[in-house]
Amino acid sequence: MPKFKQRRRKLKAKAERLFKKKEASHFQSKLITPPPPPPSPERVGISSIDISQSRSWLTSSWNFNFPNIRDAIKLWTNRVWSIYSWCQNCITQSLEVLKDTIFPSRICHRELYSVKQQFCILESKLCKLQEALKTISESSSCPSCGQTCHMSGKLTNVPACVLITPGDSKAVLPPTLPQPASHFPPPPPPPPLPPPPPPLAPVLLRKPSLAKALQAGPLKKDGPMQITVKDLLTVKLKKTQSLDEKRKLIPSPKARNPLVTVSDLQHVTLKPNSKVLSTRVTNVLITPGKSQMDLRKLLRKVDVERSPGGTPLTNKENMETGTGLTPVMTQALRRKFQLAHPRSPTPTLPLSTSSFDEQN
């Protein structure tokens, strides 16, 4: 907002200056010398110079400009354009804020983009520093002489805080500002880099003499943890059981004793039922799906007048409701017949030889 107000003030001041200039020019154009008096009627001949002067005066009077209207139009257009740009900026800012509130990932994307840009800048700077270090190492490898190296003139603006790589850890950087040769002598070149260490040979355990020779050698602590011959020789092994011993301890399934033998089965004695139900009770009261149990324990003797068949007599009169067998009676008779004549008689209970009529 302050930038926008400052810009609007500048535009207003510029428009006022232009307006004042136009007014001054218009006022000066009005102060023109008056035209010469018209010729007298006595003169008959008119010179060409007078005609041209009169025509020029007429053209100058007809060339009338409207600077005020143009300046006003420009001023209003500038104001409208500034208001339009201000509204557009406000709308875009509000939309950006709304988008950031609805989608918070946009902020993360912007931050990530800025971090990427910074990373690219740092990477480019690092590449430049690595190139500078390479050139310094090349210049240090030249033989030392009384004069400075020919490459030192190209590296006067090397920064002091340089990220040193592992390979160039011992390289000494020159100072940032070149020293004048009159006050101090040129600095000596840095010492050459040490040669890289040779690769380690693989450890081979073929003979005890080689193992002892390797055991006496020094160990490097800089690298990762290594298993030496001494560690292998000091390892103690525990005695384990072989497969044959384990098989002897675990008996085979054939050698196991059987859980139930024939003699055990022969010594088993079955107890007979103390109270065997009569054929009439088993044939009539017990259904094939139920277990055979003595129902006389659950019954209680009651003094009730009974019919010869055993059913209790009631006060209701036995009235015949119809002739013939009903479906319920046929089902009851069929069930009674099946109970009296089972298909697979049990060996414990004797077969009933009495007929269906005798049982009734």
From Swiss-Prot:
The modification Phosphothreonine is found at T33, T287, T346, T348. GO terms for cellular component: cytoplasm; membrane; nucleus. Plays a critical role in cell cycle progression. Ubiquitously expressed. A motif (D-box) lies at residues 296-304. The modification Phosphoserine is found at S40, S291, S344. It is found in: Cytoplasm; Nucleus. PANTHER family: P300 TRANSCRIPTIONAL COFACTOR JMY-RELATED (PTHR23330), PROLINE-RICH PROTEIN 11 (PTHR23330:SF9). A motif (KEN box) lies at residues 316-318. Keywords: Cytoplasm, Nucleus, Phosphoprotein, Ubl conjugation. Induction: Expression increases from G1 to G2/M phase. A motif (Phosphodegron) lies at residues 285-291, 325-330. This is Proline-rich protein 11. Residues 175-201 have a biased composition (Pro residues). The keyword Ubl conjugation applies. It comes from Homo sapiens. It comes from the Eukaryota. Residues 20-43, 174-201, 340-360 are annotated as: Disordered. GO terms for biological process: regulation of cell cycle.
